[in-house]
Amino acid sequence: MAALFVSLLALTSLVPVQGAATVPQTDYAKRAERVLRSAPLIDGHNDLPYAIRRSTNDQIYDGKLPFETSLKGHTDLPRMRKGRMGGQFWSVFIACPSDPNAPINTPKFATRDTLEQIDVARRLVDKYSKDLMYCDNPGCAKRAFREGKIGSFIGIEGGHQVGSSIAALRQAFYAGARYMTLTHNCDNAWATAASTVRAGKPDLGMTDFGPALIKEMNRLGMLVDLSHVSHQTMRDVLKITKAPVIFSHSSAYEVSKHLRNVPDDVLKTVAKNNGVVMVTFVSSFVKVDDPDSADVNTVVKHIFHIAEVAGWDHVGLGGDYDGTTELPKGLEDVSKYPYLIEKVLEAGATEEQARKLVGENVLRVWTEVEQIAKKIQRSGVLPVEEVWKGRNGTALSERSTFIEGPAPLEYGCD
């Protein structure tokens, strides 16, 4: 009887589990393909909408934007399909003021331009709805993958894009944005940027107004993105946020000492926070001392370092395609993702770990952020109304006299 049991056990060990026994362990390309069939590859940051703005002024219907055949940059539909992409956070980036030290209270066009970028991103998805699906929640992202479409989500890259206004942030959320990077390459009313520290200025972290922003993002269910912020800002936010954070396109500081990357103490805190660091590919970030020699294995090294320090539950992918001209050998455009996953498996990751890396982790974070927001809203917490100290409420507030009654014609709507 014992012999029979052993024989049956031996037979059951040969039964393939989800195809696992049908692919040799050393066939990394086929194993990568299996990973990408079973989990959506979700990239945290792609600047195609800004490339469209620069090349066509956001005009996509006149036949001059061949997204369905071939574009000049890093991203188009054929290459996304070749890259087995399951989801993309499209950055609706608008640059910081030309003078990063300009007074933040000076009216700017960034908020208007951000709305235009949200608009073109959503119109692009609608135009190519056979292949793309706009989603504003993780459940929809999973459904898009099941239906063979590429989930398309929206992220804002810097608080300057909403004029350092929590009310404007809310409206951007209602328009479809699901994450906001707290800063780009300029400080704002909420936080210090990494670029400020890189320029030799002090790292002041979050401002006194910063916690109000995090409170509202947590309440809304908007992902807090800590790429581009200073190291002290990272630490300050992680002390107060009630929800997991993301780094939409950052790598490991211990591997490459660029201030855009995440130091080990922060990686450990991200693990406690249940967040995710989505590794970027920018050559000067991943190999600051010799960017020209960066290759796919350089990126793999960053992935494994984050996995070793924070755990495989806290690492993802955020290439920054169409947002840089510096890309490692082997990762020249979005079609190269299967090759990256092949190299991750070859370096020793399991298929379970690879599935977490490509998309399961960021979906888990997004789901938890939504759940926490619903709990906060059910508790009766009201929208934040706070503004930063000293802000002028309107342009008229700078005038020396207050006029009662109907405004003169020059101030009116006529």
UniProtKB/Swiss-Prot annotation:
Substrate binds at residues 184, 260, 320. It catalyses: an L-aminoacyl-L-amino acid + H2O = 2 an L-alpha-amino acid. Keywords: Dipeptidase, Disulfide bond, Glycoprotein, Hydrolase, Metal-binding, Metalloprotease, Protease, Signal, Zinc. Zn(2+) 2 binds at residues 157, 228, 249. Its EC number is 3.4.13.19. Glycans are attached at residue 392. One of its GO terms (molecular function) is metallodipeptidase activity. It comes from the Eukaryota. Disulfide bonds join 96-186. Zn(2+) 1 binds at residues 45, 47, 157. Residues 1-20 form the signal peptide. This is Putative dipeptidase ARB_02715. Hydrolyzes a wide range of dipeptides. GO terms for biological process: proteolysis. InterPro entries: Metal_Hydrolase (IPR032466), Pept_M19 (IPR008257). It comes from Arthroderma benhamiae (strain ATCC MYA-4681 / CBS 112371). Its cofactor is Zn(2+). Belongs to the metallo-dependent hydrolases superfamily. Peptidase M19 family.
